[in-house]
From Swiss-Prot:
Disulfide bonds: none annotated. Residues 1-40 form the signal peptide. It comes from Arabidopsis thaliana (Mouse-ear cress). It is a multi-pass membrane protein. Belongs to the metallophosphoesterase superfamily. This is Putative metallophosphoesterase At3g03305. Divalent metal cation.
Length: 743
């Protein structure tokens, strides 16, 4: 009996074992599936894939930038908490991208720049609240490091690297400089690649202004952007996002750029921040592989679109449209409370910028097709039109997303023909809602079938689209009027001067082209007249200038008089050599380390933390914010002031001789008349000299402010930068005293 019982027990254990294994496997599969639904799949390289929740070939994301949370301005964080959480709950995006400058890192007087942990604690707390109030998964938030988040950080992972500790990326374990997430619909993959191009050794400001992509980062970016090229049967829309615009991004060590990689992959757009809204609303730039820039080195781009960017498409078999992408800088949260919603609808990229500072956003309208002809990727659109590759399903309807706190009862699309006037309405019709509960608010997709070929026209801004939304409370909301072009032609938009200054100038490449001509010009100012005196034995004097007037004679006379003041001539020559070959000052560039580095025109010389403890230059071209203003707005003006003082002394001396009758020549009536004409400026009152002295006082004040700001920024006093701070004021003072009395 015992043996029979043992057999039954053994049989029951044998039967139950496969059931347990099967149950365990099913449980694991269920957990994996649940995890994938919540946060997407994650491969070993940190490349996530999530499924879009829209049910259509349509996604939208939110971008925020330049939050600048500050202990001195608590309203920034308070407004962010009160506004952004509910807004995200309404918008319900697939991703939330925060493109840098999460905290401010500045003292109250804005001169000392290093990270403040209290600001990071506030950022962490606010983001936790925003995630909770939005109802979104924390994993869809991507925040990037900006230059303000890197002030005084000697290395990633150091004790003052608060970004790695308190940011969402840091807490989610996203440690690389390149992070990728793919949002997938049934028809398309949408690849988003975030890049951190901040300095690998973070200096304090103000010499921490530019993005610094390394060759390793560019190689990694290239790899991430190409991850689906040979693996997906679906088309791929590519978007990159970072903090720095390309105009404030340096080249890598091998002289490669982000622009090269972006054009190689013909991404749709590069989203960035950094510049803020104070420079203008059109901080956008179109990059095109076939465009013509002002110079071979791409130092300038005069217009938002490059010249020659709209060539005829090549429609031969297998030919692709010319590589292009848009660079879209967005406004800041710091002062303007800006937010951007960007949508990709069947491959068409559009966006709307929101301003939460001026008015509450009860209803938001984002037209997704037709695209705004001012900011569309025209090579792609024109290639499809001219080569008849247009997919009718993506062109056959006007489409828009409406985000509303209240129930939307009517959406009307209107098309205006601007050729006879701006009020010629040529189409007006209600749009039809797609999906969702008819009694619900939130994000809703609307469309209106139309005959798009009726709007083909060689003018890119003839037809304009506007959408009107009426909610259940009777509130009317109008979208911004925007031109569109079915033909894929671009409508021209011009930069203002400020917009061109920050977007059209490649500042990293302009550093040396500005610096060296300025320094060479100063050398020539002092060397040419000296050589004329020594080598050619020619003397230029006031008497010679009066006899033979001309700009060259005038300049040579003044400069030769300057050469006859040896203290001034040798002083400036020595100072110019000092500026080129010697350190300008020694300051604390890292937060709370106490270690000092010294700055030259080539960058900051710091001692690396590696075993070899080698010295390396960092912060080039960032040091241009110190070097260029000093050379152009202090040294050069001081030379002009000195020349004016020297010239005034000679003219006044001539005036005194004429009036007193002690001139060596005969008393010439013509000279006396000229002396009388000059008497007002060069009489005993010496009004011209006084005006020059006022200019020198303004120069003193500017130089003092620069010295004060640098002293506060890098914890320096006069001992740490005597050459930078004292030479120009002392030379000016010497000339003022020397030219005061006329023998």
């Amino acid at each position: 009996m015992e043996s029979i019982g043992d057999d039954d027990e053994l049989r029951s254990k044998t039967v139950s074992l496969p059931r347990r294994i099967s149950f365990t496997i099913l449980l694991l599969l269920l957990l994996i599936s649940l995890s994938t639904r919540v946060s997407g799949s994650l491969d070993k390289s940190g490349r996530r894939v999530i499924e879009a929740r829209t049910g259509q070939d349509l996604i939208w994301v939110v971008q925020l930038s330049d939050l600048h949370f500050s202990v001195h301005h608590p309203e920034r964080a308070i407004d962010f908490k009160n506004i952004v959480g509910p807004a995200l709950a309404l918008i319900n995006p697939s991703l939330v991208l925060i493109t840098g400058d999460l905290t401010d890192g500045k003292s109250k007087d804005m001169l000392t720049m290093k990270l403040n942990e209290d600001e990071w604690l506030e950022y962490e707390s606010v983001m936790q609240d925003v995630v909770k109030r939005s109802g979104l998964n924390k994993s869809i938030f991507y925040d990037l490091r900006g230059n303000h988040d890197n002030f005084g950080v000697p290395s990633v992972g150091s004790s003052v690297d608060f970004f790695s500790k308190y940011s969402i990326n840091g807490q989610m374990g996203r440690k690389g400089n390149v992070n990728t997430i793919t949002v997938e619909t049934s028809e398309r993959k949408h690849l988003f690649v975030g890049i951190d191009t901040t300095m690998h050794i973070g200096l304090r400001g103000p010499t921490n202004l530019f993005g610094h992509p390394t060759d390793e980062l560019l190689s990694s970016l290239d790899s991430h952007l190409s991850q689906w090229d040979n693996q997906s049967a679906k088309p791929v829309a590519k978007i990159s996002f970072g903090h720095f615009p390309l105009s404030f991004t340096a080249l890598s060590h091998s002289q490669k750029s982000l622009k090269d990689v972006f054009l190689k992959h013909s991404i749709s757009a590069y989203l960035c921040g950094h510049l803020h809204s104070r420079f203008g609303k059109n901080l956008k730039r179109h990059h095109h592989s076939g465009g013509i820039s002002l110079s071979d080195n791409d130092l300038f781009q005069l217009n938002m679109r490059q010249s020659g960017a709209e060539s005829t498409s090549n429609c031969s078999f297998g030919a692709l449209p010319a590589a292009e992408f848009w660079e879209w800088e967005m406004g800041d949260w710091r002062k303007n409370r800006a937010m951007r919603i960007m949508a990709i609808d069947r491959g068409h990229v559009s966006y709307v910028d929101l301003d939460f500072k001026s008015k509450p956003q009860k209803t938001i309208i984002l037209p997704t097709f037709p695209l705004d002809s001012r900011f569309m990727s025209t090579s792609f659109a024109r290639h499809k039109y001219e080569c008849q590759h247009m997919i009718s399903s993506s062109y056959d309807a006007i489409r828009a997303i409406v985000f509303s706190h209240s129930l939307v009862v009517e959406v009307v699309a209107r098309v205006y023909d601007s050729s006879p006037g701006f009020d010629n309405l040529v189409m007006e019709a209600p749009m039809r809602k797609h999906g969702g509960d008819s009694s619900s608010s939130g994000a809703t997709f609307f469309s209106l079938p139309w005959n798009y070929r009726a709007f083909e026209d060689p003018l890119p801004d003839r037809f304009w689209l506007q959408i009107e939304v009426t909610d259940i409370k009777g509130r009317l909301t109008l979208s911004e009027m925007r031109p569109f072009s079915i033909n894929g032609l671009s409508s021209k938009v011009s930069w203002t001067w400020n917009e061109f200054r920050v977007m059209g100038c490649q500042w990293a490449a302009l550093y040396y082209p500005i610096l060296w001509p300025a320094l060479y010009s100063l050398f020539l100012v002092f060397l040419i007249p000296k050589c004329i005196i020594i080598v050619f034995k020619k003397q230029y004097t006031l008497k010679k200038f009066i006899a033979k007037k001309g700009p060259i004679t005038l300049v040579l006379w003044i400069l030769q008089d300057l050469c006859r003041m040896p203290v001034v001539w040798f002083g400036y020559m020595a100072y110019l050599f000092y500026l080129i070959f010697f350190p300008w000052f020694s300051g604390e560039v890292f937060a709370d380390s106490g270690d000092r580095a010294y700055m030259t025109i080539m960058g900051w010389v710091v001692t690396s933390s590696g075993a070899d403890r080698k010295h390396e230059y960092i912060g080039q071209p960032d040091v241009m914010v110190v070097v260029i203003p000093h050379v152009v707005f202090v040294v050069i003006p001081s030379v002009l002031v000195v020349c004016c003082l020297v010239a005034e002394r000679e003219i006044y001396k001539d005036h005194i001789r004429t009036v007193s009758g002690k001139k060596e020549d005969d008393h010439d009536r013509g000279r006396k008349k000229r002396s009388q004409r000059r008497s007002l400026l060069f009489s005993n009152r010496r009004l011209f000299r006084k005006s020059v002295l006022l200019a020198s006082l303004a120069l003193y004040w500017k130089h003092f402010k620069n010295c004060w700001a640098l002293g506060r920024a890098y914890e320096m006093n006069v001992v740490h930068f005597p050459g930078y701070s004292l030479v120009v004021p002392l030379l000016l003072l010497y000339v003022i005293c020397k030219t005061h009395k006329v023998p």
